[in-house]
Amino acid sequence: MSEDVSKNLSETLFVKHKQAKETSALTQYMPTSQKILDEREEHEDRAWYRHLRRIQWAWQGLSPIEMEGVLSKIASSNHSRTEDKWLDTVMGYHGGNWTFEWIKLGMEHQRRANEMKGEEAADELFTASLCFSIAGYPHLKNDNLAIQAQVLANKAYSEGSEKTKYVIKQIEVPYQKRKIIANLHLPRTDKQLPVVMVSAGLDSLQTDMWRLFRNHLAPKDLSLIHI
């Protein structure tokens, strides 16, 4: 994906959502549960609404330096927040907003991919996909910004799959009269290989498992299917 096309897609997806509700404002709790949460917050000293998965994101391939760079931009924002006590609750799609800053980093990796070929380009695109996935984290179903970020994540992953030497394709898995879309990753196609099936939590995407496949499964001739 060219830099201009990537930028245009981002602008198209987010143009109607610049005043979208900030993620922390979307979850509604039962009165009894809200009381418990309020009491817990009184005893917790946390500065972020989201749980920052620094170790996991680094393991998945994100540079710790880039990660801290994004978090510092979010933390230092002067824009209004849904909750002043939580740094990552900047309202509106602009600088300092969680989704905005991670999308910006993802687009930088897409730009780098345009200057590379083969596996290097694929790695940049898969990293871009991870950034877009984090932009939508924790992937609440009614979060419009997160939904748009997922579109970018899937697009970047698809672009990366076309450049890598490995085979990545979507398949349909029948389940209870329905069909589930899954991503199948194959290190080679000249013979049948064992398959590792992964089903992550609701706060992750199918596109988050690239490094697990490339670094740990593919060298051992293991395929990966992520449902």
PLM feature spans:
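Long, non-catalytic architectural segments outside compact domain cores
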Residues: 1-94
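Alpha-helical protein-protein interaction scaffolds
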Residues: 52-160
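N-terminal cap/lid segment of alpha/beta-hydrolase-fold proteins
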Residues: 102, 148-188
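An acidic- and aromatic-residue-enriched active-site/binding cleft used to recognize and process polar
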Residues: 187, 201-202
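Short beta-strand element of the alpha/beta-hydrolase
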Residues: 192-201
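The serine-hydrolase catalytic nucleophile loop
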Residues: 203-214
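A short, Lys/Arg-enriched amphipathic alpha-helix followed by its capping loop at the start of a domain
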Residues: 216-222
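Conserved small/polar residues in nucleotide/adenosyl-binding loops
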Residues: 225-227
